[in-house]
Amino acid sequence: MKAYIYDDKPGDQRLPHDTGIDIPEPTLAKLGVVYQRIPIDSEGAWESKIDEFAKERGYKNRDRITVTREGLGEAYEEKIKSFFDEHLHEDEEIRYILAGSGYFDIRGAEGVHEEQWIRIALEAGDLIVLPAGIYHRFTVDSANTITAMRLFQDEPKWTPYSRKADGTDKLGSRDKYLETVRVGVTA
């Protein structure tokens, strides 16, 4: 995992857009992001570590998603664009990268890189939890392939609320997230 300030220059979203300004893990933690490195080993020890993590956090369900040009065919470009629309969820977004690589961009919040995009580069063995209410977006990198395990507390659901839509800033999950960040920054 590598996190840094996104350069916000026009161009292919799948390129690094690295400003050279690194963001350390404690800063991500202030924004509510949980990160763990759980290397994928041939013996399968990673699976028991994921099971343990899921049990600790109350994740009862999981599935796998693969994003490739071959797998999605003509829908690939449209799907990538939809993932890259700035949005939030009312539940945590949990991903364990099994193969390939990509980027999660998260929006800074009050007192922590406010309104700047922070790009988090992920590869196989990286586990990330984005808190409910955080604005974010996702894209594969220039390799155009990623396979991830998605974990869910209840029934699998993935409802994005676009920042462009009326009312998104007023969702309870957004208010709760901002309050959590305020407390974390001032604590």
UniProtKB/Swiss-Prot annotation:
Q: What is its EC number?
A: 1.13.11.54, 1.13.11.53
Its EC top class is oxidoreductase
Q: Which InterPro entries match?
A: ARD (IPR004313), ARD_euk (IPR027496), RmlC-like_jellyroll (IPR014710), RmlC_Cupin_sf (IPR011051)
Q: Where in the cell is it found?
A: Cytoplasm; Nucleus
Q: Where, by residue number, does the polypeptide cross the bilayer?
A: none
Q: Does the keyword Cytoplasm apply?
A: yes
Q: What is this protein called?
A: Acireductone dioxygenase
* Organism, as annotated: Cryptococcus neoformans var. neoformans serotype D (strain JEC21 / ATCC MYA-565)
Lineage of source species? Eukaryota, Fungi, Dikarya, Basidiomycota, Agaricomycotina
- What is the gene name? ADI1
